[in-house]
Amino acid sequence: MSETKTYCGFIAIVGRPNVGKSTLLNKLLGQKISITSRKAQTTRHRIVGIHTEGEYQAIYVDTPGLHMEEKRAINRLMNKAASSSIGDVELVIFVVEGTRWTPDDEMVLNKLREGKAPVILAINKVDNVQDKAELLPHLQFLGSQMNFLDIVPISAETGMNVDTIAAIVRKHLPEAIHHFPEDYITDRSQRFMASEIIREKLMRFLGAELPYSVTVEIERFVTNERGGYDINGLILVEREGQKKMVIGNKGAKIKTIGIEARKDMQDMFEAPVHLELWVKVKSGWADDERALRSLGYVDDL
């Protein structure tokens, strides 16, 4: 009896910051593995999300948003991670936002033109476009920019047409053995996912007040006798004022962040979690490549 053919390939999700790449990845996978926030530049590592359906396995690379400014070491590294993701994939999903077109979009497009992989153009947030009459000319403009494999208007938030993207992806996966067991959804460790969950809550509850100079280090991640996990998270900020902001009045802010992060961790790890958080000032970490290496920002470049 002949063996069933299997199909497997890597797909990069690219675009300028804050167009909805992480939301799209989470929808394609059916659960949350990439942090989402209304702030630009929330994805700092290339998260690999794995979706296996029967004989098809799609491995998604969620890049940081490519962007023009490269002043700080962390932004240079994020751009490098995004650019290197484009080079070694079977397919690219280029995410843009509604009828907006910016120099950053243009820069991403230029990088894609240099590549060999076919590109699906996903026009996100079309449900937010007020004047629908603007949409058709904009679609025609985008279609003339490059020979796209397909152009799909989507809403990553509501899931509109995300199944269309998934179907196109499946159709273009090469015949290959599956790289991961079928129950895997990410190759990232639980420790890494714990730090991402804490960072998402920081973004969510501190919003515009908090600059990007914040990161999370998991100092302890152990199983306990109750069948759950004891996790200690260290939140690193650059200035004393930021530390006070994270802690909040009488510790209220960090308590909320801890409670919400613990809930998400318990959902993800399917086990009880005991979480403790500390805040520490480590000035200049976002400018120091050595510090970034020690925090794991360049282990995947």
Curated annotation (Swiss-Prot):
Protein name: GTPase Era
NCBIfam families recorded: era, PRK00089.1, small_GTP
Domain Era-type G: 7-175
Subcellular location: Cytoplasm; Cell inner membrane
Gene3D superfamilies the UniProt entry points to: 3.30.300.20, P-loop containing nucleotide triphosphate hydrolases
Gene name of the record: era
CDD domains reported in the protein's UniProt record: Era (cd04163), KH-II_Era (cd22534)
Subunit: Monomer.
InterPro entries assigned: G_ERA_dom, GTP-bd, GTPase_Era-like, KH_dom-like_a/b, KH_dom_type_2, KH_sf_prok-type, P-loop_NTPase, Small_GTP-bd
Every KH type-2 domain range: 206-283
Ligand binding (GTP): 15-22, 62-66, 124-127
Residue numbers spanned by region G5: 154-156
UniProt region (G2), positions on chain: 41-45
Keywords, alphabetical: Cell inner membrane, Cell membrane, Cytoplasm, GTP-binding, Membrane, Nucleotide-binding, Ribosome biogenesis, RNA-binding, rRNA-binding
Membrane topology designation: Peripheral membrane protein
Domain of life: Bacteria
Family to which this protein belongs: Belongs to the TRAFAC class TrmE-Era-EngA-EngB-Septin-like GTPase superfamily. Era GTPase family.
GO annotation terms (biological process): ribosomal small subunit assembly
Region feature (G1): 15-22
Pfam families, A to Z: KH_2, MMR_HSR1
Protein's job: An essential GTPase that binds both GDP and GTP, with rapid nucleotide exchange. Plays a role in 16S rRNA processing and 30S ribosomal subunit biogenesis and possibly also in cell cycle regulation and energy metabolism.
Keyword Cell membrane on entry: yes
Entry keyword Zinc: no
Alphabetized HAMAP family for the sequence: GTPase_Era (MF_00367)
Species name: Cronobacter sakazakii (strain ATCC BAA-894) (Enterobacter sakazakii)
Region (G3): 62-65
Region (G4): 124-127
